[in-house]
Amino acid sequence: PPPNPEGTRQARKNRRRRWRRRQQQIRSISERILSTCLGRPAEPVHLQLPPLERLNLDCSKGTATGVGSTQIPGESCAVLGSGTKE
């Protein structure tokens, strides 16, 4: 979590600096793990997504249709609603 905003100005500045340094270390370690162990770059590969118009939910079948599965197993389509305001 981000640093606590309490304390003197100098204390907050030090906490932010330490927090940023810690986050940089985490990023550095994760990049190293991804590149050496998994053999892939740390940068995410751009994923081509289909247009939203092609995605739909078909509640009559009990499963989602379209590209990929968008329904949570065990969840009813009625929970999602029609998307229109009443």
Curated annotation (Swiss-Prot):
Motif Nuclear localization signal and RNA-binding (RRE) boundaries: 8-24
Entries under Pfam families matching the protein: REV
Record region (Disordered): 1-25
Keyword set includes Phosphoprotein: yes
Gene3D superfamilies named among the record's database cross-references: 6.10.140.630
Short sequence motif Nuclear export signal and binding to XPO1: positions: 47-58
GO annotation terms (biological process): mRNA transport
Main subcellular location: host cell
Domain of life: Viruses
Segments of skewed composition (Basic residues): 10-24
Modified residues (Phosphoserine): S69
A molecular-function term among this protein's GO annotations: RNA binding
Entry GO CC: host cell cytoplasm; host cell nucleolus
UniProt-annotated location(s): Host nucleus, Host nucleolus; Host cytoplasm
Keywords (A to Z) from UniProt: AIDS, Host cytoplasm, Host nucleus, Host-virus interaction, Methylation, mRNA transport, Phosphoprotein, RNA-binding, Transport
Post-translational modification (record): Phosphorylated by protein kinase CK2. Presence of, and maybe binding to the N-terminus of the regulatory beta subunit of CK2 is necessary for CK2-mediated Rev's phosphorylation. Asymmetrically arginine dimethylated at one site by host PRMT6. Methylation impairs the RNA-binding activity and export of viral RNA from the nucleus to the cytoplasm.
Note: HIV-1 lineages are divided in three main groups, M (for Major), O (for Outlier), and N (for New, or Non-M, Non-O). The vast majority of strains found worldwide belong to the group M. Group O seems to be endemic to and largely confined to Cameroon and neighboring countries in West Central Africa, where these viruses represent a small minority of HIV-1 strains. The group N is represented by a limited number of isolates from Cameroonian persons. The group M is further subdivided in 9 clades or subtypes (A to D, F to H, J and K).
Job description of the protein: Escorts unspliced or incompletely spliced viral pre-mRNAs (late transcripts) out of the nucleus of infected cells. These pre-mRNAs carry a recognition sequence called Rev responsive element (RRE) located in the env gene, that is not present in fully spliced viral mRNAs (early transcripts). This function is essential since most viral proteins are translated from unspliced or partially spliced pre-mRNAs which cannot exit the nucleus by the pathway used by fully processed cellular mRNAs. Rev itself is translated from a fully spliced mRNA that readily exits the nucleus.
UniProt subunit comment: Homomultimer; when bound to the RRE. Multimeric assembly is essential for activity and may involve XPO1. Binds to human KPNB1, XPO1, TNPO1, RANBP5 and IPO7.
Entry text on domains: The RNA-binding motif binds to the RRE, a 240 bp stem-and-loop structure present in incompletely spliced viral pre-mRNAs. This region also contains the NLS which mediates nuclear localization via KPNB1 binding and, when the N-terminal sequence is present, nucleolar targeting. These overlapping functions prevent Rev bound to RRE from undesirable return to the nucleus. When Rev binds the RRE, the NLS becomes masked while the NES remains accessible. The leucine-rich NES mediates binding to human XPO1.
Name of this protein: Protein Rev
Native source organism of the sequence: Human immunodeficiency virus type 1 group M subtype U (isolate Z3)
Encoding gene (name): rev
